[in-house]
Regions:
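Soluble extracytoplasmic regions of secretory-pathway and membrane proteins
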Residues: 2-609
Length: 609
């Protein structure tokens, strides 16, 4: 059955099937704006405006070696072409029509983009590690050294006993004690480790709590920075006569990154590092980054711009002053060594065969030596066999680097060994330093509780990582470690003791307000609290300080100690002297309890009558 519609469609609408189709509606032609010169001026003006806003916000380096520069130029060209579409009255359709328009009306942007693409491709090819493996492996000049003869034993006042996490904890706690600052400011996350007056410290500025607090305090700037002593764990708040106005926490023109970009538009920079000079003036050390292989490969640093954080004054130094500690970042040095370790026998050897291919271990630490800070990291074979074959020490100011052959356990194996000694206390080990103890390569690390506070110290022999010593102070730890080395016939009898000179001692005087005693591992330990103190500040062992049992409340004493005998809670006495005028009474009767199973002897100590 055929169904026919005549005069109306299926929906009931009238139509004439024989009528001719209606012609398409013609598009009304768009008119171009002004003259050709006027259109070019408008297009250029809008492009420059967009470029200025982008440059102010994103701050790309105007440098062919900077990848972001290509994106910036591409944005300018695209902006110009879009403006030209509107100002020229373009009505084309399809990709072909747009392409034809761009070639005719946007000739300059078209050829600029084409040139950029060619330049980027050639630059990437000339930077390709497959073709330039020899150049990549030569980025970091490396000399070999002898551990026993070149690595000197470090005195206690040069060993950093805090890691970054513990320093941050102390910094936050210190700011919380400052009622005039804690409501407006926070501690920044820099915590740069430097050598300051011959001591290892971490320094960090404050930052504004939020945008409102920045608005309220911007005219005065940031009022202070913190110095955390890595040996004594003391935190000092350095208040400035004039606040820091050029930091990473600032906004607009005083923002450090923007300040650098406007002053040095063609420079590429590493992440700025906060340091202070020997006078305590805060600076930002901004290493100048360069690409040395092709256009985009072989990242290296060449000199640095120093920016005064207070005034904003800046100057480029090809050779930075001696007080500067961080020109080459740890990440850069490690990256360059990994290039050396992988490619010194060619690129294809790093994939097939892997003869003598080495890489750095996961993790690194810092060590103060002379006036500089050295990066330490281990070196292992590419197979990852849980053992080190040596380690690197690299000067972060000059990039002078030495490799020391030293086979033994990896840092993480040593950390596991140390944690195993205190597993009942659940302490965590920090990433270790490598020290020379009686010509034995030794891992040194702090043991922290869950609150990130340092409670003990550990030393692990690199060659025989089952030799582990712990102690409440660095001195205790070293003494125990030397005895273990002696028992294992690794050192001679004359190396089993620690040489001490009178200059190694410091002293503190006070009148005894309270004495408590405890028995730890069979030894009588005495804890002293002086007048004016709210907590016990001196700990002494009767085995080392013979006069300790004769002390009484009311005695005025001078306690001698060494830097390495200092913990967060007390100093470890090496000797005590009874000063003139003190009471000379009979020895008190002492009552004590065993604390072999206690983590804190003071909590279990009994007060002496």
């Amino acid at each position: 059955m055929d169904i026919k519609f005549s005069g109306s469609d299926a929906g009931g609408f009238q139509f004439d099937p024989n009528a001719a189709p209606k012609p398409k509606r013609e598009r009304k032609p768009r008119k171009s704006i002004g003259s050709k010169g006027g259109r070019i001026a408008v297009n250029t003006l809008v492009t420059l405006l967009v470029g200025a806003v982008f440059f102010y916000v994103q701050m790309p380096a105007i440098n062919l070696h900077a990848e972001e520069f290509y994106g910036f130029v591409l944005l300018l060209c695209v902006t110009y072409c879009i403006c030209a579409l509107f100002t020229s009255g373009f009505q084309g359709t399809g990709a072909k029509g747009y392409f034809t328009f761009v070639k005719k009306q946007c000739t300059v942007p078209f050829f600029v983009v084409a040139a950029l693409i060619v330049t980027a491709l050639v630059g990437a090819l000339t930077s390709w590690v497959v073709l330039r493996a020899k150049d990549y492996q030569a980025l970091l000049p490396i000399d070999s050294g002898s551990f026993a003869s070149e690595i000197e034993e470090v005195s206690y006042d040069r060993i950093p006993m805090l890691d970054r996490d513990s320093a941050e904890k102390l910094g936050d706690r210190k700011l919380g004690e400052l009622a005039d600052m804690v409501s407006q400011f926070e501690v920044a996350e820099n915590y740069t480790q430097i050598n300051y007056h011959g001591r290892p410290v971490r320094v960090t500025p404050l930052r504004y709590g939020d945008i409102i607090k920045w608005f309220n305090n911007r005219s005065e700037g940031l009022p202070a920075y913190l110095i955390i002593d890595m040996v004594t764990q003391n935190v000092e708040v350095v208040r400035l006569d004039e606040g820091m106005k050029y930091t990473t926490a600032e906004h607009f023109s005083r923002n450090l990154y923007r300040h650098l970009r406007f002053a040095y538009p063609t420079y590429m920079f590493e992440e700025p590092v906060f340091e202070i000079n020997e006078d305590g003036t805060p600076y930002w050390v901004c290493a100048k980054k360069e690409k040395t292989i092709g256009l985009f490969g072989g990242t290296d640093n060449h000199g640095a711009v120093l920016v005064n954080a207070i005034t904003g004054e800046s100057e480029y130094y090809e050779e930075p002053p001696a007080w500067v500690d961080h020109v080459y970042s740890a990440e850069l040095i490690i990256e360059q060594y990994d290039y050396y370790g992988q490619y010194h026998n060619g690129f294809w050897n790093s994939i097939f065969g892997q003869r003598d291919v080495t890489v750095t271990t996961d993790g690194y630490n810092y060590l103060a030596e002379g006036d500089d800070v050295y990066l330490y990291t281990g070196v292992t074979s590419v197979g990852g066999d849980e053992s080190n074959i040596g380690f690197l020490l690299s000067n972060q100011r000059t990039k002078e680097t030495k490799y020391y052959p030293c086979a033994g356990a990896t840092e993480y194996s040593a950390m596991d060994s140390a944690e195993g000694q205190v597993q009942n206390l659940r302490y965590n080990a920090t990433f270790p330093l490598l020290l020379n103890i009686s010509e034995q390569p030794t891992y040194f690390m702090a043991l922290k509780d869950a609150s990130q506070l340092v409670k003990m110290y550990a030393m692990v022999n690199v060659n025989q990582y089952q030799i582990v010593a712990i102690g409440a102070t660095v001195a205790d730890c070293e003494a125990n470690y030397r005895q273990m080395l002696l028992k294992n016939n690794l050192i001679s009898d004359d190396q089993g003791s620690i040489d001490v000179t009178p200059n190694d001692y410091k002293s503190v005087e006070g009148t005894i307000a309270e004495i408590r005693t405890a028995v730890v591992d069979g030894n009588s330990i005495y804890f002293l609290r002086f007048d004016g103190e709210s907590a016990f500040s001196v700990r002494m062992s009767a085995a080392e300080v013979a006069y300790a049992p004769l002390l009484n409340v009311g005695d005025r004493v001078c306690v001698y100690y060494r830097d390495g005998y200092v913990t967060e809670n007390w100093i470890e006495a090496s000797d005590v002297e009874l000063l003139d005028g003190s009471a000379q009474s009979a020895p008190p009767v002492e009552t004590s309890v065993s604390t072999e199973d206690s983590a804190d002897p003071v909590e279990n100590a009994q007060e002496m009558p």
